[in-house]
């Protein structure tokens, strides 16, 4: 299918499709151009079939459209000389269509999918860094962005559309990548965005409350994550045995690799396993000793906190399962770098230690505070807020966690979006036994400044919620703002 021809593309589904040379594939009629294939899907908010006339006017070569309520599956029509092929369940088929269009890029690199509530970004970054240290040109796709390491381009969503994902992977293959670690969101799984990818390995980090505004309850959220293993080509399964959901899944996945730092592994019951035997936390990170099916070892990590030890062990187990030699992984482990905006430490002489993290769920905030406490000789401060137009139920939970685990809580704005900022703050305060305990300051930059300037030299200030983000959404505006830049300026260092 080197020439990207419509007939070849549709051969598995519509053998009598007409021959048309195709330039690009797009779901967006606004960018459709001469020679393109426009795919008209029915989405949650819009019916792409309404934009077929616009796409034709812009010179597309062909159209594939959802058949439901319009035509029979495989029906071929013509509009103004442009073939329109109707397929039923087009959203479900889209990943496979895009895979054929872009020459099945997941066949041409080692693709590792990482799913879970927290830890996806750090785990994918560690996987890509480690494989690159072992000589593989490596890439990442996810929350921070997509691209070869060192050339990552920011993106809007953790997992793009089915077409975007295949297009991005094809681009990475063209740039020489032989390894890619991809964050796989629950939305992406439910919406079939990675349905046709061939993962070499699939990693589960953990499951805790998030996205219930979309999934409704934890049962549906868990079911969405399980799709990676039940309905996809998942390859090697790497599962966090310290998570209750992970332990349930391990019972259903006898060939999976079990990973633990809390002694949730019985080597006699698990075929392949990796577990921490001793972890020593210190100012510059942690010393981790482990045992595994592949042998024992010790790693010096520059990452903060227990959950990052878990992320590192998951990455290590994944690479071992893929055949990377343990000796080579141990030799290169000390060169793994902390991830931008993920428990990222900023220090300066005479100033408090400031940690910037993406924690924006109750579980992540608790773990971030526990991690920061391990490195804190004085008071532990926590600056945080909650996003507007999102799950309101987590707000009081996060307030309670800040009150329990921080010495000083500063409650501020996150991305208020179209909600009233003070109303969000009040929801957070409702979870505290003593609402007067918290300092309240709506302006985020002002709140961060207040905490950093008032904290003492041996204090630690955790600035949670935005991590790597360089914007704040207020109303419908996307304003320039970065916790990292704000903190660096206050400490007189470079972000």
Swiss-Prot record:
<dbReference type="InterPro" id="IPR013221">
    <property type="entry name" value="Mur_ligase_cen"/>
</dbReference>
<feature type="binding site">
    <location>
        <position position="390"/>
    </location>
    <ligand>
        <name>meso-2,6-diaminopimelate</name>
    </ligand>
</feature>
<dbReference type="GO" id="GO:0008765">
    <property type="term" value="F:UDP-N-acetylmuramoylalanyl-D-glutamate-2,6-diaminopimelate ligase activity"/>
</dbReference>
<keyword id="KW-0963">Cytoplasm</keyword>
<dbReference type="InterPro" id="IPR036565">
    <property type="entry name" value="Mur-like_cat_sf"/>
</dbReference>
<dbReference type="GO" id="GO:0009252">
    <property type="term" value="P:peptidoglycan biosynthetic process"/>
</dbReference>
<dbReference type="Pfam" id="PF02875">
    <property type="entry name" value="Mur_ligase_C"/>
</dbReference>
<dbReference type="GO" id="GO:0071555">
    <property type="term" value="P:cell wall organization"/>
</dbReference>
<keyword id="KW-0133">Cell shape</keyword>
<dbReference type="GO" id="GO:0008360">
    <property type="term" value="P:regulation of cell shape"/>
</dbReference>
<dbReference type="Pfam" id="PF01225">
    <property type="entry name" value="Mur_ligase"/>
</dbReference>
<keyword id="KW-0436">Ligase</keyword>
<comment type="pathway">
    <text>Cell wall biogenesis; peptidoglycan biosynthesis.</text>
</comment>
<keyword id="KW-0067">ATP-binding</keyword>
<feature type="binding site">
    <location>
        <position position="27"/>
    </location>
    <ligand>
        <name>UDP-N-acetyl-alpha-D-muramoyl-L-alanyl-D-glutamate</name>
    </ligand>
</feature>
<feature type="modified residue" description="N6-carboxylysine">
    <location>
        <position position="225"/>
    </location>
</feature>
<keyword id="KW-0132">Cell division</keyword>
<keyword id="KW-0547">Nucleotide-binding</keyword>
<comment type="similarity">
    <text>Belongs to the MurCDEF family. MurE subfamily.</text>
</comment>
<dbReference type="InterPro" id="IPR035911">
    <property type="entry name" value="MurE/MurF_N"/>
</dbReference>
<feature type="binding site">
    <location>
        <begin position="116"/>
        <end position="122"/>
    </location>
    <ligand>
        <name>ATP</name>
    </ligand>
</feature>
<feature type="short sequence motif" description="Meso-diaminopimelate recognition motif">
    <location>
        <begin position="414"/>
        <end position="417"/>
    </location>
</feature>
<dbReference type="InterPro" id="IPR004101">
    <property type="entry name" value="Mur_ligase_C"/>
</dbReference>
<feature type="binding site">
    <location>
        <begin position="158"/>
        <end position="159"/>
    </location>
    <ligand>
        <name>UDP-N-acetyl-alpha-D-muramoyl-L-alanyl-D-glutamate</name>
    </ligand>
</feature>
<dbReference type="GO" id="GO:0005737">
    <property type="term" value="C:cytoplasm"/>
</dbReference>
<dbReference type="GO" id="GO:0051301">
    <property type="term" value="P:cell division"/>
</dbReference>
<dbReference type="InterPro" id="IPR000713">
    <property type="entry name" value="Mur_ligase_N"/>
</dbReference>
<dbReference type="GO" id="GO:0005524">
    <property type="term" value="F:ATP binding"/>
</dbReference>
<feature type="binding site">
    <location>
        <position position="465"/>
    </location>
    <ligand>
        <name>meso-2,6-diaminopimelate</name>
    </ligand>
</feature>
<feature type="binding site">
    <location>
        <position position="185"/>
    </location>
    <ligand>
        <name>UDP-N-acetyl-alpha-D-muramoyl-L-alanyl-D-glutamate</name>
    </ligand>
</feature>
<feature type="binding site">
    <location>
        <position position="469"/>
    </location>
    <ligand>
        <name>meso-2,6-diaminopimelate</name>
    </ligand>
</feature>
<keyword id="KW-0460">Magnesium</keyword>
<comment type="function">
    <text>Catalyzes the addition of meso-diaminopimelic acid to the nucleotide precursor UDP-N-acetylmuramoyl-L-alanyl-D-glutamate (UMAG) in the biosynthesis of bacterial cell-wall peptidoglycan.</text>
</comment>
<protein>
    <recommendedName>
        <fullName>UDP-N-acetylmuramoyl-L-alanyl-D-glutamate--2,6-diaminopimelate ligase</fullName>
        <ecNumber>6.3.2.13</ecNumber>
    </recommendedName>
</protein>
<keyword id="KW-0961">Cell wall biogenesis/degradation</keyword>
<feature type="binding site">
    <location>
        <position position="29"/>
    </location>
    <ligand>
        <name>UDP-N-acetyl-alpha-D-muramoyl-L-alanyl-D-glutamate</name>
    </ligand>
</feature>
<feature type="binding site">
    <location>
        <begin position="44"/>
        <end position="46"/>
    </location>
    <ligand>
        <name>UDP-N-acetyl-alpha-D-muramoyl-L-alanyl-D-glutamate</name>
    </ligand>
</feature>
<dbReference type="InterPro" id="IPR036615">
    <property type="entry name" value="Mur_ligase_C_dom_sf"/>
</dbReference>
<dbReference type="GO" id="GO:0000287">
    <property type="term" value="F:magnesium ion binding"/>
</dbReference>
<feature type="binding site">
    <location>
        <begin position="414"/>
        <end position="417"/>
    </location>
    <ligand>
        <name>meso-2,6-diaminopimelate</name>
    </ligand>
</feature>
<keyword id="KW-0573">Peptidoglycan synthesis</keyword>
<keyword id="KW-0131">Cell cycle</keyword>
